[in-house]
Amino acid sequence: MLSSKAGPIGIFDSGYGGLTILHGIRQLLPQYDYLYLGDNARAPYGPRSFDVVYEFTRQAVVRLFEMGCHLVVLGCNTASAKALRSIQQLDMPKIDPERRVLGIIRPTAEVIGSLTRSRHVGVLATEGTIKSESYNLEIQKLHPDIQVSGVACPFWVPLVEYNEADSPGADYFVKKRIDEIMRKDPLIDAIILGCTHYPLLMPKILKFLPDGVRVVPQGEYVADSLREYLNRHPQIEQKCSQGASVRYMTTENPEKFKEQAQIFLHEPVEVESITLGNL
């Protein structure tokens, strides 16, 4: 039986990337409690099938609900692309129709119209997100005049997950994909980082990006969207506890997660171990 008491806002990601979403949300909405769950043991999600990503994501969402969350944000583009709609339409009516699961693709698609002059936009993301064409569909729905080009970056998530973001190898893989997307459409003037891991590669991305091309990370736009959502849905906002606390959980090595999280968040964190079901 799920608790009806107010609880933390859940943030789920396949690994460390969702920390960029959590950081953006906490900057804007510091008063709430948060519960972050990283499925590092099964990362990356990008190459996995729709069915597997859906099942892994569903397991995580259910666990976060069991731990008291009434609202869960999928801080993972692959999960948002491959699992969100199925969970919202098929699972939530059975689990608890009063609880909510939100994704992070639409908030970025909503604002991109104000961030491009050329109306040519690039998306750098995982293989799964690019194949799903979720960004193309959302942007075309909201901004039919924008042309979207996407490139998959299969090695970028492992660079972050294995703490190689500052390595010479990172230079090679980042430059390769930046060059590829600019060849694909030289008129691009805004690039969406369609994976929450990618802002952790920002120094490399900026190093190789042509002048005049804007990088669009998602954190601040997701935070703005979440604030508006809570304002529009007071019945959900009242179920989000306000103690300004954060609890971190990982399915892999808590010590490794702690080290990585502290590097990015610039604050000490305590990390707990958690197990999710396996296929």
Language model: regions and residue ranges:
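Non-catalytic structural scaffold of enzyme domains
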Residues: 1-279
